[in-house]
A protein has these predicted regions:
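Solvent-exposed, non-transmembrane regions of integral membrane proteins
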Residues: 1-821
Length: 821
């Protein structure tokens, strides 16, 4: 049957390029494998050439798949399931790219694209390591290709195809109106596409600029871990157990920098888009990304140890192998659906669990077996490191990082243990503290070791020189610490004095880390920044620690409920920590006066932007924050909020919406009820009463407007609410050319409208009173003050700059040595 309006050519081209991706990566893997095995140089050259052509073919295919899928999404071709599920016509152009990585298929393609780019760079620069390293990278590409084929092999579906048509996805099976004779068992109508007006849209939480740039950086970090892994396996394969260190070092630095930045970009997205009031929640998916970075950092430091002293080569092999395996394990965790109930980041289950598990095991089993088999052959120095040597303490630091990673991944894997062993292990009652109570001591140890490591020499250190060089850093650090102790605070006593004291210790040592490493730039490398990459990275790391410790321990909720107005709140929200603002009614909040000035709606979506004015009570500052909220968005019940923040050099004011009126109650169906009263009389309404204060008549009115005998009557009223609040309102009515024209007064906080219908000079008045829920416009918000959070963000970038600077220097040195040879 021909279906009207379908565009099949893009999908057919996409299917062709997926097939080329699959075949090209397989041929590249085999070609490079044979190139690594053969002895004759002529044969090796031919296999290498075939490998390069095949790898280039699969790389072009991945790029073409990416371009075609973007074309489908951009042109709203909703006959394709991926476009219908992840995009909509109302989606802003800048968020179209984010549609790729909302779905599993698109994120696999992003991973493959990043890995292709790295593979092309390796072809150019790997030299004699090209064949074994590219064989492993190509096999990883082949594994990713199987994830997006959607082919059936002996009844088993391999992967999920991004070019699947909507009519083949099963989504329309239960839509009788789209089938012939309204029978779901009959084929779809030829014109079914005319009923598909729009797509399902992108998750509102992903409609943020960080989600356009964060996933590509993160997946480049994921992809980059294959390179040190491939070098390590290639070394075991070719028995060149020590020679791989030099070419692997720049890649290790690159991977550590990019993956670290990618992870913290996710923290920035969480800070600006999620409403839990922070940047890190020890979410299982966050942890699954953090652990490979930690083992990669451990591997980087043991690699440096081996390069300088010959120690720790076995540990370097293990750490780099585990880094990539943890990436694959995190892929299994986030995509298998096993974390669906414990993480806000996890993908939904596409029925690929066995394939994802195979992806992990097919790398894990051979690589770990190869490592164990070759363990005794890996060179090692029998003489123990000196306790005063740099390598001794660097290894201790690497070991601490590794053990910390094992603790994190162990707790993160509780759902996996429960699934495997049919147990019911429950996470701790306070999940965040269960992590923090361990990691605070890791932070203390690492801060101390990071501060002193550069002042130690490899193999042995002269104590006199060490203490001489450390004199000024220690002195300045003590002064800075005393300054913070007397002027700063750690307002975190709810977990007891021991934990609070640990935070103090970590802050002091973080200051020491920053000052000691900044000093080393001048003491150790004489101010030559190009040689100070390690110290710069350590300064950034100290800033990250300090930013986390100060901002988290002193985070202050400033939206204390001072007006007592109740509002329906989401699960877990404390009414005492949420402040309700009635439109145009100023409310005190700490050192600010807040006013809800209005809102505006998105022209195409159920998205509201709220204008909240913050005024400093001392009159020195006046600004507006505009948090937004989604209500019943695309059928999802409840409130979804995006925060807004005001940034200062020393703190952030961070706020998000926690409650708004139900839009279905905003239609006004109530009517005025009339009362004939005189001065001093009382009128009762549902939430209180009114007293007529007086009747005033203004006769001096413009005759051209009011006529010859026109008058303006004003009736001030005192309003007494059940909540104890008192208000004054004034209702006015004009007598113009024989007709009454009322000018009502609205008391928004009470949902009350007072209308002066008639009045006379004796003081007798006829008042219309109306109460309506539609009148009461309010928002409830929660606000935090985050001190010195910029230390965290700047620290991330400084760490990355230091690592990339070190990478540049290593590449430059390697190139110079090759030229000299």
């Amino acid at each position: 049957m021909n279906y009207i309006g379908e565009h099949l050519l893009p999908g057919q081209l996409g299917q062709l390029f997926i097939l080329l991706f699959l075949i090209g990566s397989a041929v590249a893997c085999l070609s490079y494998f044979f190139a690594a095995q053969v002895k004759l140089e002529s044969d090796k050259s031919l296999w290498n050439l075939l490998g390069r052509i095949s790898f280039f073919t699969q790389a072009v295919s991945v790029l073409a798949i990416f371009a075609i899928l973007f074309y489908i999404i951009q042109n709203h071709l909703f006959e394709y399931h991926y476009a219908w599920k992840h995009s909509s016509r109302s989606l802003e152009f800048k968020y179209l790219l984010a549609c790729f990585w909302e779905g599993q298929e698109g994120s696999f393609l992003l991973w493959a694209l990043c890995q292709s780019i790295l593979g092309l760079l390796l072809i150019r620069n790997a030299g004699k390591w090209e064949a074994p390293v590219l064989s492993i990278v190509s096999f990883a590409q082949f594994s990713l290709a199987t994830m997006v084929t959607g082919l059936y092999i002996f009844g088993w579906k391999m992967g999920s195809n991004p070019f699947m048509l909507l009519r083949d996805s099963g989504v329309l099976d239960n839509a009788p109106a789209l089938h012939l004779n309204f029978d779901p068992l009959q084929p779809l109508r030829p014109d079914y596409l005319t009923s598909i007006k729009d797509g399902n849209d992108l998750n509102p939480l992903l409609q943020n600029y960080w989600m356009v740039i964060h996933p590509p950086v993160l997946f480049m970090g994921f992809a980059s871990t294959i390179v040190p892994f491939a070098y390590a396996i290639a070394a075991l394969w070719t028995k060149q157990l020590g020679e791989w260190i030099k070419p692997a070092l720049p890649w290790s630095l690159f991977s550590t920098a990019v993956l670290g930045v990618g992870i913290m970009m996710g923290g920035m997205w969480a800070y600006e888009s999620l409403s839990f009031g922070g940047y890190w929640a020890w979410d299982p998916v966050e942890n699954a990304s953090l652990v490979p970075w930690m083992t990669g950092v451990a591997g980087l430091h043991t690699l440096l140890i081996y390069k300088a002293t010959g120690h720790s080569l076995r540990a370097t092999f293990l750490f780099f192998i585990l880094t990539f395996l943890f990436i694959l394990y995190s892929t299994f965790l986030t995509r298998s659906g096993i974390l669906g109930e414990t993480s806000v980041h996890a993908f939904t289950d596409l029925g690929m669990n066995w394939q994802l598990l195979s992806f992990l095991l097919i790398f894990a089993i051979p690589s770990l077996w190869w490592f164990l088999k070759s363990y005794s052959q890996i060179p090692t120095i029998k003489k123990e490191e000196e306790a005063s040597s740099r390598e001794f303490w660097m290894f201790i630091g690497s070991l601490v990082i590794f053990l910390s990673a094992i603790v994190i991944i162990g707790q993160t894997s509780l759902p996996v243990f429960n699934k495997l062993f049919n147990t019911k292990l429950a996470p701790p009652a306070d999940v965040e503290f269960s992590y923090n109570s361990v990691q605070i001591y890791v932070a203390i140890i690492l801060a101390f070791l990071t501060a002193i490591s550069h002042y130690l020499k490899y193999r042995t250190t002269d104590r006199k020189i060490f203490w001489k060089n450390m004199f000024w850093p220690i002195g300045i650090s003590l002064l800075a610490s005393l300054l913070y102790i007397f002027m700063g605070e750690v307002a975190y006593d709810r977990k007891g004095p021991v934990f609070q004291a640990s935070i103090w210790a970590a802050i002091v040592l973080s200051l020491y880390t920053i000052i000691a490493n900044a000093s080393y730039i001048f003491i150790g490398v004489k101010g030559k920044l190009k040689n100070a990459g390690g110290s710069i990275a350590h300064v950034g790391f100290g800033m990250v620690l300090l930013g986390i410790l100060i901002s988290s321990s002193n985070k202050e909720i400033i939206s204390n409920n001072v007006n007592g107005i109740p509002a329906p709140l989401g699960k877990g929200e404390n009414p005492r920590e949420n402040l309700t603002l009635v439109k145009d009614l100023p409310i005190d909040m700490g050192s600010y006066t807040l006013t809800y000035e209005g809102d505006s709606a998105h022209p195409k979506k159920q998205l509201w932007y709220y204008k909240i004015r913050f005024k400093k009570k001392d009159g020195q500052e006046d600004f507006v924050l505009s948090p937004n909220a989604f209500v019943n968005y695309k059928g999802n019940q409840g409130l979804m909020a995006n925060p807004s923040a005001r940034h200062y050099w020393d703190h952030d004011v961070f706020t998000y919406i926690t409650s708004i009126p139900d839009p279905s109650n905003q239609k006004d169906t109530s009517r005025f009820k009339s009362y004939v009263q005189k001065t001093g009389d009382t009128i009762f309404y549902a939430n209180g009463y009114l007293i007529v204060d007086s009747t005033k008549i203004r006769k001096e009115v413009p005759k051209e407007l009011f006529g010859e005998n026109g008058k303006l009557f004003e009736v001030p009223l005192n309003v007494f609410s059940k909540t104890g609040s008192n208000y004054k309102v004034t209702s006015r009515s004009a007598y113009v050319k024989g007709q009454w024209i009322a000018l009502p007064d609205t008391l928004t906080s009470e949902g009350l409208i007072v209308l002066l219908e008639q009045a006379n000079e004796t003081g007798k008045v006829q008042l219309g009173i109306k109460q309506s829920d539609a009148i009461l416009k309010y928002v409830t918000l929660k606000a935090y003050k985050y001190p010195f959070i910029k230390l965290l963000w700047y620290g991330v970038w400084i760490t990355a700059i230091g690592l990339l600077l070190s990478m540049y220097n290593r590449i430059k040195k390697n190139s110079a040595k090759q030229l000299s040879i």
